[in-house]
Amino acid sequence: MAPEVASHVERHCTTIRRGPDYLFHLILDSMVDDYAVVVDRVTASLDSLERGVFKDPSPHQLARLLKLKRTVSRLRKTLVLEREVLARLMRGEFELVNEREIAYYRNVYDHLVRYTELIESAREMVSDLMQTHLAAASNRLNHIMKY
C-alpha cells in the first residue's frame, strides 16, 4: 500500500499541494484496492470448496468451510466499519475533507460497497455449502445405516 502512494507522490509533486485530505484519499484508495485481491482469494476458495463438497463431503472440507466462514465474517465486519467511516467523512461529520475532494472519497466508498456486497454473497454461499455438506453427510450416513 505505502509504496504505491509514495511512488504516486514522487511522480506527481502536485499531490502534496492538494493537501492532506487528498493524500489521505490516496492511502485509503490503495488500502481498498488491496481488498480486491482478498475478495478474489475468498471467491477462489469458495469455488474450490464447492467442487469438493459435491465431490466428497469430508470432515476436512467442513473444517475448511468453517475457517473460510470466520475469514469472511472478519472481512465483512472490517469492510462495513470502513464503509461507515467513509460515509461519515463524505457527509461532513468530520471537517477533514475539502469539498472538492469528496468525489474521490465517493469513488473509494463505491469500491467498498462493491466489495462488501461480494463478501456478503460469499457469506451466503459459505452457509449454503455448509448446509449442503451436512445434508450430504447425513445422506451418506443414512445410506450406510441401511446396509
Residue spans for each PLM region:
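Peripheral, non-transmembrane regulatory/ligand-interaction domains of membrane transport proteins
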Residues: 1-100, 104-121, 127
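Membrane-interface, cytosolic juxtamembrane amphipathic helix immediately N-terminal to a transmembrane helix
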Residues: 113, 119-147
